Amino acid sequence: MNTNFVVGGWSSVLWSRLLLCVSLVFAFALPGCEKYDELVAKDQDCQAKWSDYEGELQRRSDLIPGLVETVKGASKFEASTLTQITQARADATSIKLQADDFTDPAKMEAFQKAQDKLSHSSLSRLLIANENYPQLQASARYGELMKQLEATENRVLRARQQYNNAVRGYNTELGKIKGSVVNKATGKPFKPRVYFAATAGSEVAPKVSF
C-alpha cells in the first residue's frame, strides 16, 4: 500500500475541510461585520443630529437674556413674568443628558418638558408683550431679536424632527433579525434610543406678529 498516497489523500481532505470551514466563517462573519458597521454609522448619525439639536437650543438660550433686557427697558412689563422666563431658561439649560440617558424614557421626557416649557409657556409671554405694549413695536432691537427667536424656534423643531428620523432609522435596523443577532453576538453595545414624543403645541413654533 502506498502510504504517500494515503497521507496525501488525507492532507487533501483536511485542506478541503479547512477551506470549507474558513469559507463558512467568512460567509457568516462578513455580513455580520457589515451590519455592525451599519449600526455604528446609524448610531453616529443619531449623535450628530443630537449635536445639531443642542446647537439650536444653545442659540435660543443665547437670545433670551437680550430679549428680557430689551423688554424690561422698553416697557413696564410684569417683573414676575420676566423672572419666570429667566427661570425657565435656567431649567432648560440645567438638564444635561449623558450617553445612557438617550435610552431612558423618563430622562428624555424630563428634558423635553423643560424645553417645551421654555418655548410654549414662557417665550409665548414675550409675544403677548408685543400686543399689550405698543412701545415695544417701536423698538428695532426687540423686533430683530424676536424675528431671530422665531427663526431659531423653527430650526429647533426641524432639528428635533431630524433627530427623530435618525433614531427611527437606527432603531429599525437594530430591531431587524440580523441587527438583533449581531448586537447580541457583540455583547449588546447598541440599545434602542428614545424618540421625542409629540406634545400638544410643540410641533408649531411660536409666531411673531408685528
Question: What is each stretch, according to the model?
Answer:
Residues W10, L24-F26:
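Short, intrinsically disordered, low-complexity terminal segments
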Residues F5, S16-L20, A27-F210:
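A helix-centric hydrophobic-segment signal that preferentially recognizes long
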Residues M1-L14:
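N-terminal secretory signal peptides that target proteins for export/translocation
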